[in-house]
């Protein structure tokens, strides 16, 4: 057998959801640059699920469906109050809440395509409510009920702090949600597909995906970037901090990518929003530090920034808690997970790869009383 560690370069399935070709990311044939500058997140959700952009009436219907399904069962909110809040990472709370949602859905184990689509709508609608509600409850604040008159991005920000966001904040969140919505066969998406390929339910697939996204090598990088920026403190400290890490051969979070060779096409959009927001909020040091870090790392290591690098300072400028960065990733990426889950169901085959055995050769059983300690 030939082993490909990390399955790098292995084509494991075919998909019509998104593609990465020659460092260009597209959703169902639409360039990510085009979508980020022109579309709403709701349009992108529809695109990922249907492989075409919605008409005005189709978009209105989806928005209404999302608004109608955004509320959480009271029991989920009650469970949040039972968690050891000071110890629970929001990703763990999100993973648990999504699994619990299945208990309140009468269609949880109904596997026809129409029921699966309805569950997709419910999950897409409820994830931002879960994240925002937990974020407030752990601070001793009451959850903010979702509003039906706001966009998906604006409503998410509104539920987080109870204030209707301004146009710039809404634009920033909308762009971030679009940019994180799907990314071909990444670790969490592959996890979701492996799970539902067993014909497990939609909730199980999304719960498994959240578990994969929780890992720092996948979804936690922007939180690590913000931790690094906080440790650096000021632009004047960047040079010594980064060069010391490079000398020690320590990883600089937010740079390089397994798939992209010339640079992550999503990063430039977040870089622009980071610059705009940090200046508008009177916190230009976060962007200034990021620029200095980028110049050193790209110059010394030839590694361009990825989607995680500038999203950190952008989210921070929006006043979002650092440990919510990865849950926000999930709020967006669930749209892609659901698209892949529905696609897997439509043309399913159990995913069962092989492993090269590297253990001992054939051995003979020895009774326990005759075994010698090594």
State the predicted function of each range.
Residues 1-374:
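Non-transmembrane, aqueous-exposed alpha-helical and coiled segments at domain scale
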